[in-house]
């Protein structure tokens, strides 16, 4: 039986799903309904009353369009479709009244409010309100909350829409915000005055329709109309969240989420949102050469000449690909190093990932598959630290009835999970069981780097792949590096390469700051920040950060995405691919591309699937050879969410958040 229902909205008859609310039906008809409390990704509260519409033939009063479904409408005379009016005199009068009530206690802070220029209350007061107020009584005042270093509160501006409460409870999975009191005495507050303990809390800034919750680090720095807005991709984890980079002059002022149903919906992690101050600190803005044990500033010809001299004289040459390197730079490095007889490696954490089997390193599931899964298994991972937005999607599936199982040490998750066991050998035990019942349900297995960086990582990956095959589950590999899948796609690996790198006498380090390079080798470091890699370098070539050059990144599910340049690199720093092209000229082996466009053409010619931007290819590959899984508990490789890369480690705000997280953990252990 069809669930489609006919309905007449402002004189236009349309056919919609009966389960839709009236506000959704109006959107289907192309009619915008004002709202404050309603949000399509949160539960329905129905408390702002701004979305009132007139239902002809219904009760003689306006109806809240966010809370009434189409199937509940009474048909018209002789079975005619129900009629809805969104712009009748009754509706206009109701909206004016609601707006007047909302503004009764609202302060006239617009000139000094950070929300000014992008405020729903401003826009809707202009569109649906009146130009005078009948209220002559004193306005109420409330104390501001201390929610931590990220969210600044101005609670006199709050209209009690409860979006922040619903987000923290339903999506972030914490219960530290709530509403107390009734009527004029109602207010949003935190539990016992606690600061928020979530790495997704910054999203309540976007959700707040007024200026009650604003960004504390961004406060009073810029107005929305002063900013240049650029669509790009996040690289703080391997999910590849869609983001907007707002810049003022040459500086990045803030990051905001963009809607992408297949990846991040419209949420981003706090590291993604607030790491921008790390782009301003500890930057490499000029080349350096080490002489007599100390680094000195050099010119580009000097630095490139010194690097070329070392490469030409190398008996064993190796290249390392860091966690934030775009595909273009990785592809260029591979051609440069292999052209000089060297090897290139992107698996700098020792992950046992086969570069010739895309189904094994990019998985067979999509992020979107998690939403519909009835069973989810986590192997050697803590998604709350490794990919907070992915963790929110797992929580979303859990709230819809999915069962979550964990193999490995039990992490502190935001949902209930069945701890199957900590030992990796449990995978072998599970393979011996009958999975016919599970195979009938949609399910996803998520494997983390905590499992794959072990010495038996290849055996664990083969076991997880076999388990996915037995249960007819999708396999998702949760990488911790944004560059990893793209680097594997272009073949930036080599058998036994980590052993070869240990023996190399010249190492070209493309932003790999997460490993220690042994003494003795001559190190050429190309990167954006003065982090661990730069401290070990003999030559430093300053490169652009991810907001300062166009770059291709492939996320954990194998989706190619483009990061767009939003600003320019500081000082004499250059785009990463251009540095490698210039160095190839010094080596008399000039790479065959002289622009970013020609480089991308070469990449797509060699790897056609990378030309399908924002599409997830169906990953294929042979079953991996089974190996012996050793005893031992699986643990996550990420222990400090806020300090996982050089940009984050340069951020003062990330350092503060890291210290706060450690203090909370210490307090919790002391309480036990």
Q: What residue spans do the PLM features occupy?
A:
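Structured interaction patches on ligand/partner-binding surfaces of diverse proteins
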Residues: 66-77
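N-terminal export/assembly segments and adjacent metallocofactor-ligating motifs
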Residues: 2-27, 35, 39, 55-58, ...
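Short, glycine-/polar-rich solvent-exposed loops and beta-turns at beta-strand/coil boundaries
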Residues: 38-47, 69, 182
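Short acidic beta-strand-loop surface patches of small beta-rich interaction domains
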Residues: 43-47, 52-59
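Long, low-complexity segments enriched in small/aliphatic residues
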Residues: 597-672
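Acidic, glycine-enriched active-site microenvironments
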Residues: 8, 51, 66
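Non-catalytic alpha/beta scaffold blocks inside enzyme catalytic domains
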Residues: 348-613, 665-672
């Amino acid at each position: 039986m069809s669930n489609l229902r006919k309905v007449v909205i402002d004189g236009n008859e349309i056919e919609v799903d009966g389960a839709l609310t009236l506000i959704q039906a109006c959107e289907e008809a192309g009619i915008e309904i004002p709202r404050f409390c309603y949000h399509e990704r949160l539960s329905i509260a129905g408390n702002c009353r701004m979305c009132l519409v007139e239902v002809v033939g219904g009760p003689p009063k306006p109806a809240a369009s966010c809370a009434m479904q189409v199937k509940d409408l009474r048909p018209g005379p002789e079975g005619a479709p129900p009629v809805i009016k969104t712009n009748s005199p009754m509706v206009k009068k109701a909206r004016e009244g609601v707006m007047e009530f909302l503004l009764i206690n609202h302060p006239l802070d617009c000139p000094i409010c950070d929300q000014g220029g992008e405020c729903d209350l401003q826009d809707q007061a202009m569109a649906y309100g009146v130009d005078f107020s009948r209220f002559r009584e004193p306005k109420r005042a409330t104390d501001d909350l201390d929610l931590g270093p990220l969210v600044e509160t101005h609670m006199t501006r709050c209209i009690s829409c409860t979006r922040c409460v619903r987000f923290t409870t339903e999506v972030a999975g914490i219960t530290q915000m709530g509403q107390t009191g009734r009527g004029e005495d109602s207010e949003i507050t935190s539990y016992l005055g606690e600061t928020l303990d979530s790495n997704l809390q910054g999203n309540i800034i976007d959700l707040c329709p007024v200026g009650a919750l604003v960004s504390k680090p961004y406060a009073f720095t810029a107005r929305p109309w002063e900013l240049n807005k650029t669509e790009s991709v996040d690289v703080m984890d391997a999910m590849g969240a869609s983001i907007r980079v707002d810049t003022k002059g040459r500086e990045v002022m803030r990051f905001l989420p963009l809607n992408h149903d297949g990846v991040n919906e419209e949420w981003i992690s706090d590291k993604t949102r607030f790491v921008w101050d790390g782009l301003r600190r500890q930057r490499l803005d000029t080349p350096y050469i080490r002489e007599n044990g100390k680094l000195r500033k050099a010119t580009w010809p000097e630095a490139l000449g010194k690097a070329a001299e070392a490469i030409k004289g190398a008996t064993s040459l190796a290249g390392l690909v860091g966690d934030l390197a775009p595909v273009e730079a990785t592809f260029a490095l591979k051609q440069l190093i292999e052209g000089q007889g060297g090897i290139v490696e992107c698996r700098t954490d020792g992950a046992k990932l086969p570069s010739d089997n895309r189904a094994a390193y990019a998985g067979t599931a999509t992020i979107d598959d998690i939403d519909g899964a009835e069973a989810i298994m986590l192997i050697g991972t803590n998604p709350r630290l490794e990919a907070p937005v992915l963790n929110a999607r797992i929580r979303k599936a859990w709230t819809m009835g999915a069962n979550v199982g964990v193999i490995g040490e039990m992490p502190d998750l935001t949902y209930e999970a069945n701890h199957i066991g900590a030992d990796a050998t449990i995978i072998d035990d599970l393979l011996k069981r009958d999975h016919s019942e599970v195979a009938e349900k949609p399910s996803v297995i998520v494997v983390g780097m905590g499992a794959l960086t072990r010495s038996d990582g290849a055996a664990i990956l083969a076991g997880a792949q076999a388990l996915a095959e037995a249960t007819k589950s999708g396999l998702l590999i949760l990488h911790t590096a944004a560059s990893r899948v793209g680097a594997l796609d272009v073949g930036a690996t080599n058998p036994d390469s980590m052993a070869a790198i240990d023996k190399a006498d010249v190492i070209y380090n493309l932003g790999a700051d997460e490993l220690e390079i042994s003494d003795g080798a001559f190190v050429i470091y190309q990167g954006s920040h003065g982090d661990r890699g730069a401290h070990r370098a003999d030559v430093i070539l300053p490169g652009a950060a991810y907001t300062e050059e166009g770059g291709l990144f492939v996320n954990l599910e194998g989706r190619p995405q483009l990061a767009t340049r939003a600003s320019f690199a500081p000082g004499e720093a250059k785009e990463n691919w251009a540095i490698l092209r210039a160095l190839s000229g010094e080596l008399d082996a000039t790479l065959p591309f002289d622009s970013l466009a020609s480089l991308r053409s070469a990449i797509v010619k060699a790897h056609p699937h990378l030309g399908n931007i924002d599409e997830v290819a169906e990953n294929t590959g042979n079953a991996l050879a089974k190996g012996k899984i050793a005893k031992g508990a699986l643990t996550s490789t990420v222990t400090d969410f806020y300090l996982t890369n050089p940009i984050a480690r340069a951020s003062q705000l990330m350092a503060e958040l890291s210290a706060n997280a450690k203090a909370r953990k210490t307090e919790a252990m002391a309480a036990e």
